[in-house]
Amino acid sequence: MELWDLYDRDRKPLDKTMVRGDEVAPGTYHDVVHICMFNHKGEMLIQHRQPFKDGWSDMWDITLGGSTQTGENSRTGAHRELCEELGIDYDFTNARPALTINAPGIFDDFFLIDGEVDPGTLRCQPEEVSEARWAGHDEILSMIDDGIFIPYHKCFIDMLFAMYATGSMRSRPDTTVPHEK
């Protein structure tokens, strides 16, 4: 049984937990983390979700996403999820989320990180992930169009790539999103 800590709308702990799969009570929130790992070519590591997984089964997704468990913060939850799902031990000690999405019942922290991994050597968690590979910005947008990638807003994918390329939410004239030719 997986337990999640609950927070109020200002992200203050409520000293309450909920069981994964239960409905989030009105006025309470739990933490979710997403990680986008980018390589030196500006490609994102993407994962293919298992066909039997609940929610977005048999679809491609960003590097990973998952809920933090009781006693974890976003950094420790991101570390655990990355180790569990892909077998990558990444040091999140000094990491901060690049952005937080506030959605009904959740605070969703997105980490944009560097990584040079060979997808063929990853230890994908068989209950969650069937495979992983690198993909560029334009390829991910095409995969969304083809209905094989979770249907994120394309402008959101644009923003993730731009934020990684610039290291900021603000554009800089000397840095552009790496589109394939």
Where are these regions (language model features)?
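Nudix hydrolase/Nudix homology domain
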Residues: 58, 99-181
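A glycine-rich, hydrophobic loop/mini-helix early in the fold
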Residues: 32-64
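Short, solvent-exposed loop/turn elements at beta->coil junctions and helix N-caps
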Residues: 20-24, 96-102
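Short loop segments at secondary-structure junctions
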Residues: 10, 39-42, 50, 114-119, ...
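A short, polar/proline- and glycine-enriched secondary-structure boundary/capping micro-motif
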Residues: 25-27, 55-60, 133
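The catalytic Nudix box helix
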Residues: 45-46, 63-96
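Acidic, metal-coordinating catalytic segment for phosphate/diphosphate chemistry
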Residues: 1-34, 38-40
